């Protein structure tokens, strides 16, 4: 998201021009990919994950929703960052659930909370959203998947102004540390 925002800012001199051109491109893409299935907040996809009909969700739904959401937000359109996380997570969980031996709807519920956790960098909020949406019986499962997704997001968030109470090393910082350690080991 950050990369595309910078790329578009460099590519288009005028923000109005960027929004007009990219809006037209996004509109065409939305119609090409299943006549608008991926437009909006994605609540339609979340509902399809839990309707019990297995043919309604495609294995690529999550990636197309994610790509189009990133493209939309990087083009300068504001709002609608959170609801697509639920949609992306539900679709991904629905697809991965059977791979790990879970019911697709159970996987969709876990994906719902864990992608929100990772995308927003909020551990407790994601667990509570999952519990509020799917019931207290899911608390242990949400706790585990949200903890794992929180650990592996390395303080990244869709919210650029978010402040964190404690910092974890980023992927780049860990790589620098490893390279300096290897360099020191070679020199010694």
Spell out what each predicted region is.
Residues 1-188:
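Alpha-helical transmembrane segments and immediately membrane-proximal extracytoplasmic
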């Amino acid at each position: 998201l950050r990369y595309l925002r910078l790329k578009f800012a460099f590519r288009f001199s005028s923000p109005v021009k960027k929004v007009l051109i990219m809006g037209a491109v996004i509109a065409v893409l939305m119609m090409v990919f299943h006549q608008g299935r991926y437009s909006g907040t994605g609540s339609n996809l979340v509902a399809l994950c839990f309707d019990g009909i297995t043919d309604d969700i495609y294995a690529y739904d999550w990636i197309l929703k994610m790509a189009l959401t990133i493209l939309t937000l990087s083009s300068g359109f504001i709002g609608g960052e959170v609801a697509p996380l639920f949609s992306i997570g539900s679709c991904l969980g629905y697809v991965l659930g059977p791979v790990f031996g879970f019911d697709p709807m159970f996987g969709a519920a876990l994906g719902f909370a864990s992608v929100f956790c990772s995308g927003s960098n909020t551990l407790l909020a994601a667990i509570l959203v999952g519990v509020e949406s799917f019931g207290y019986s899911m608390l242990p499962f949400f706790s585990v998947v949200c903890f794992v997704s929180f650990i592996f997001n390395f303080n990244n968030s869709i919210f650029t102004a978010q402040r964190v109470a404690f910092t974890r090393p980023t992927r780049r910082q860990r790589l620098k540390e490893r390279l300096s350690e290897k360099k020191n080991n070679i020199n010694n």
